[in-house]
Design a protein with these regions (language model features):
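Tandem repeat scaffolds
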Residues: 20-26, 30-265
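Non-Sec secretion/translocation targeting segments of pathogen effectors
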Residues: 1-18, 28-30
Length: 265
C-alpha cells in the first residue's frame, strides 16, 4: 500500500506527470493504488488529480467515456471520488491547508470536471483556479472567493450564494439560474453567454463587467441599495421581464440590449 507521495521539489515536481507520459492502463492502475490511502494532503491531491486528468484528456474525443470528480468538503478535509463511466476508480480524503483568511485553500488548482456536493460550502478559496465543466450542487455557498478564476460552463445548483467574490473571474456559459445572489461581487468579471434567469439579486455589484449575451430573464433586483452596472459592457444582454427598484447603468455599453420591466419604483 502506498502511504505517501514523495514531495521533494514542491508542487512543480508533482506536476511533471503529464499527458505525454504513460498510458491509460498504467495510469488507471496507478490511480486505483491510491484508493483509501490515509494521510493525503494538498500536494497529493494535485498529483492524483493530474493522473486522473491525463486519462480524461486522452479520452476526450471518445464521448462514450464520462469522467468526473465528486467532491465534498468538511472542515479542513475534502473527500474526492474519481469516477470513470459511473464507476468509482479511486476515493480519497485530503487534509487541506487554510489561507491567511482562514479559507480552505483550493487556489491555483485545475478543478476541471469537479462536482461539488454538500449542504453548505463555506469559506473556500478558489482564487485563480481553473473551474471548467464544474457543478456546485448544494443548499448554500457562502464566503467563498472566485477572484480571477476561470469559470467556463460552471453550474450553480444552489438555493443561495452570499458574500461570494467573483472579481475578475472569466468564463462563458455560467449558470446561476433560480439562485438567490445576496452580496455577490461580480465587478470586473467577464461572464459571457451566462444565465441569471429568475435570480433574486440583492446588494450585488456588476460594475465594469463584460456580460455579452447573458440573460437576466425574470430576475428580481431586490437591494437595499441600487444595483450597479457602472461602465459595464451589456451588449446583447436580455433584461426581459425583470423587477428592479433602483439601478445604476452609467457609462454602460448597451448595444442590442433588450429591457422590459415588470416592476420598478
Amino acid at each position: 500500500m502506498i502511504s505517501h507521495i514523495p514531495n521533494s521539489g514542491g508542487n512543480n515536481s508533482l506536476m511533471k506527470h503529464d499527458v505525454v507520459q504513460g498510458n491509460n492502463i498504467v495510469d488507471l492502475d496507478l490511480l486505483r493504488n491510491f484508493n483509501g490511502v490515509p494521510g493525503l494532503n494538498r500536494d497529493n491531491f494535485i498529483y492524483i488529480s493530474n493522473i486522473f486528468l491525463n486519462i480524461k484528456q486522452r479520452n476526450e474525443k471518445n464521448h462514450t467515456i464520462n469522467m468526473f470528480r465528486e467532491v465534498s468538503i468538511s472542515n479542513d478535509t475534502i473527500s474526492v471520488k474519481f469516477y470513470r463511466n459511473e464507476k468509482i476508480e479511486c476515493a480519497c480524503n485530503f487534509l487541506m491547508d487554510k489561507d491567511a483568511q482562514g479559507y480552505i485553500d483550493l487556489s491555483d488548482m485545475n478543478l476541471t470536471s469537479c462536482h461539488f456536493k454538500g449542504d453548505v460550502i463555506s469559506k473556500v478559496s478558489f482564487l485563480s483556479s481553473n473551474l471548467q465543466h464544474v457543478t456546485f450542487e448544494c443548499k448554500e455557498i457562502g464566503y467563498c472567493n472566485f477572484t480571477t478564476a476561470t469559470v467556463d460552463n460552471v453550474i450553480f445548483r444552489c438555493r443561495r450564494l452570499h458574500n461570494v467574490i467573483f472579481i475578475k473571474a472569466s468564463g462563458e456559459c455560467v449558470d446561476f439560474s433560480k439562485n438567490i445572489l445576496d452580496t455577490v461581487d461580480f465587478s470586473r468579471s467577464q461572464l459571457t453567454h451566462s444565465n441569471f434567469r429568475e435570480c433574486q439579486i440583492r446588494n450585488s455589484n456588476f460594475d465594469h463587467c463584460y456580460l455579452y449575451a447573458s440573460h437576466f430573464t425574470r430576475a428580481e433586483f431586490l437591494s437595499d441599495k441600487e444595483i450597479s452596472f457602472i461602465k459595464s459592457n451589456l451588449t446583447a444582454v436580455m433584461f426581459d421581464h425583470v423587477r428592479i427598484s433602483t439601478g445604476n447603468f452609467k457609462d454602460c455599453i448597451t448595444e442590442r440590449v433588450e429591457l422590459t420591466i415588470d416592476y420598478s419604483d
